[in-house]
Amino acid sequence: MAEFKEISPNASATEKVTNWFENRIPTAFDAYKVHISEYYAPKNFNFWYIFGSLALLVLVIQIVTGIFLVMHYKPDANLAFASVEYIMRDVPWGWLVRYMHSTGASAFFVVVYLHMFRGLIYGSYRKPRELVWIFGCAIFLCLMAEAFMGYLLPWGQMSYWGAQVIVNLFAAIPFVGPDLALLIRGDYVVGDATLNRFFSFHVIAVPLVLLGLVVAHLLALHDVGSNNPDGVEIKGPNAPRDAAGHPLDGIPFHPYYTVHDIFAVSVFLMVFTAIIFFAPEAGGYFLEYNNFIPADPLKTPLHIAPVWYFTPFYSMLRAITSEMMYALMVCVVGGAALAIFKFKMPTLLKGAIVVAAAVVVASMLSIDAKFWGVVAMGGAVIILFFLPWLDYSPVKSIRYRPDWHKYLYATFVINFVVLAYLGVQPPSAIGERVSQVGTLFYFGFFILMPWWSRIGDPKPVPARVTFVAH
């Protein structure tokens, strides 16, 4: 038991109450000091460093609005659609809560995509922050699962058929696919059993995992310290410190960055509320018009597409056709040949590469392209987990990389946006070809990163962070 701290009898009531709690639960106060008031962050944070806090804010909005929606929602195939309409029409302020939740889902992905992009350009996945990045990617994967399961709950036409299409993709997995799809659906078609399963996962299981990953992400971040736009370590063994041992290039998170984030939150909430009140459907991108029609298992919509934040990966799924498989085989053979003849390695390893390439090519010839589309869609997310070990650049931040790296990253962003656009559009010959090129570029960006990230002469990295006082 820790020794109680004494306080002056003349202290204010606030100080006395604070001292009373601190004597009885000192761990909470220690955590506040470690993670907020005495957590030193680099003093040169910029615009890109607001999105982590905004992601936490949106997570809270989603949890709170979700609780109120569950009070009135009926997870029954015969009642689900009507219960959503009841929330919108008869529950006091139900329309506002529903629009906050639906807009919050899209806002969550906006801030998470921007947060991940900041990590990409500033090298926040590099040593010693590999675990921070891995936990972040796990959060992204968990968020996708949460959004997909919640997407079915309104039980509209697009929800129903979107879930039908995605769940059927699991049936393409050799040997276990049909049984796995049946397990996920709980029936031979998407129905009441599927709705109940997705509801339980969306409301209980996935949020618990998501919250655990968020805590792990923050703990890992605060243990190794935040990165900064220069990619310079402010808490390393050679970093300058003051007499108290605090980094000279750091400032306490509170009050400096709490005020910084409060301003960002204010701007974000103005945009967020403007969308809720004036364009909650966002032209059919946040809430699809087909979802205002009750689910009809006997009537398939003309065009089935996922919500906008899944569309880049949906484009990659559609890009893998039987014709595309031959291009992928050429890539596999070419990659194996390049590895064997370009790099020095033991003969045994060369043999293993040849065997692996032969197995992959044989699998591509024997297994349907639909399965490889699923692999591409999943692999597009999984490959992000390996980013810390793919980047061989001598510098972290894009600021000090060769200029052509910036153009490459810009092309990557444009390619991702184009894939997202194509995923919303109905299939077409031109769209298919463009999405195939975009898919090859997406994977080539990461797979070839160990090679292209070394090319070029980086600019000198400063010993300390660059900071100009405002």
Annotate each PLM feature.
Residues 2-107, 111-470:
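Membrane-embedded and interfacial regions of multi-pass energy-transducing membrane proteins
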